[in-house]
Amino acid sequence: IMRDGRLMPLDIRYIDPLAAYFNRIMARHRRKMPEIEFGMAEYLSAFYPSHDISLVVIQNALDHSANPMKSIYESIDVLKKGGCLYLNHHINEAETEHYKGFHQYNICREDGKLIIWNKNERHDVAELTAGFAELTVGLTENGHVAAVIRKTADVPQSLIDDKGDKRALCSLFMENARTASSPWHGLKNSAA
């Protein structure tokens, strides 16, 4: 609601890398929900380049991402100054799930700090975003880690530069193409 009592128009978007699958499931079960758009938090500024978003919500998804810190940087980047990134996640889900499937990162609160970690790396989110964001972190009633990150300045371009990502994606694509073109590719999973 605006100060003069009028309702402010909202443009709410739902994004997920698996949008096509979720949309099919919702259609199959005749769910009346907004359609989910394809998008990846690690590349959010490619989908929303205008830097005028007020709120980004990431719920139970950072632990699934390929690069949680890049997801945070990109999410802050698309926000207007003063905009907020809200995070809500199960505590240390990768440990709970034994690093199986999508669960490759843990998210927790330690000594009042938001920490993202796995067996190979550990990140203090407030420390890594100190020059362009303010962070508060707590626990919800259901025991999830919740954080609000408010954008205070522009994200340094070096943190959202995607040239290295493009190289890695091209290498991954070429490796998959080599594997797929192997005459043995179809046999690997067919023997049971």
Question: Where are the model-predicted features located?
Answer:
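A short glycine-rich, Lys/Arg-flanked "PGG" loop and its adjoining helix->strand segment in the class I
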Residues: 69-84
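Core SAM-dependent methyltransferase catalytic element
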Residues: 125-192
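Short conserved AdoMet
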Residues: 7, 66, 80, 130
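A short SAM/SAH-binding and catalytic strip from SAM-dependent methyltransferases
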Residues: 54-67
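Short alpha-helix
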Residues: 105-137
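Class I SAM-dependent methyltransferase SAM/SAH-binding core
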Residues: 1-44
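A short acidic, Gly/Pro-enriched loop at the edge of an enzyme's catalytic core
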Residues: 39-56
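Conserved class I S-adenosyl-L-methionine
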Residues: 84-113
